[in-house]
């Protein structure tokens, strides 16, 4: 992430994992936060701000459930977690996306903003 957004270098860690299916991937994101929070607060924030770019679900989903999804990613609220390390909180969020259609639609949305 720091290579794309240098101002975030060292602040967040994330990876995108292409799962062994023809059309589906996930983002595994870990962020250190300054303000202590809860899993419920995090999920409430994602749910409240859900839109065509970033959706939110609490349904138990798997990679095949997001095939043909046009959103940038779908946050899986069931997998949100908080890890406490030396008095600091690491927020763990997982989001699924269609690495074909979802990616294409996200590129179109990005181009519209340029």
Each model region followed by its residue ranges:
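C-terminal substrate-binding/catalytic lobe of Rossmann-fold NAD(P)-dependent oxidoreductases
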Residues: 1-91
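Glycine-rich phosphate/pyrophosphate-binding beta-alpha loops
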Residues: 18-19, 96-103
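Internal hydrophobic alpha-helix adjacent to the cofactor/substrate pocket in enzyme cavities
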Residues: 105-114
């Amino acid at each position: 992430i720091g290579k794309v957004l240098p101002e975030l270098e060292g602040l967040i860690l994330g990876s995108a994992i292409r799962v062994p299916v023809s059309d589906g991937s996930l983002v595994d994101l870990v962020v250190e936060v300054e303000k202590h929070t809860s899993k419920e607060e995090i999920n409430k924030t994602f749910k409240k701000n859900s839109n065509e770019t970033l959706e939110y679900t609490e349904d138990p989903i798997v990679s095949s459930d997001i095939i043909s999804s046009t959103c940038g990613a779908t946050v899986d609220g069931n997998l949100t977690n908080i890890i406490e390390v030396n008095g600091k909180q690491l927020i763990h969020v997982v989001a699924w996306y269609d690495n074909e259609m979802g990616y294409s639609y996200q590129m179109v949305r990005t181009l519209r903003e340029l």
